[in-house]
């Protein structure tokens, strides 16, 4: 299957300008949510590693999920995510021990929440860090609105 690449950001809607006050006459254009996916292994992230996911500058992260086919195991089943080798700027250590989907969030941390709201003036690379080696295998899914804050 072939793919098409847009430089974005991409907006969609069929009423481009507001000409009235009722539905159908009020602008309804919105941003398209983008997604990037990276395979993750617990053993491969025992030392912080780049996931290969790069979020464009001024983007708004709306959701991060870990979809495990094998739950993380060992002394700790945690993973953390960030924008550097520290790998904690986006998600603090969170258990991903179960098979299936686990939602990863900034929690109640103001600094992490602000980074989700706007990644800043530069593209950011997502790093993952597991607490220890283990059997965990899955896909990291990051959904974002491209350059919403530009």
Residue ranges and their predicted role:
Residues 2-150:
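Surface-exposed, low-hydrophobicity beta-strand/loop segments enriched in small/polar/acidic residues
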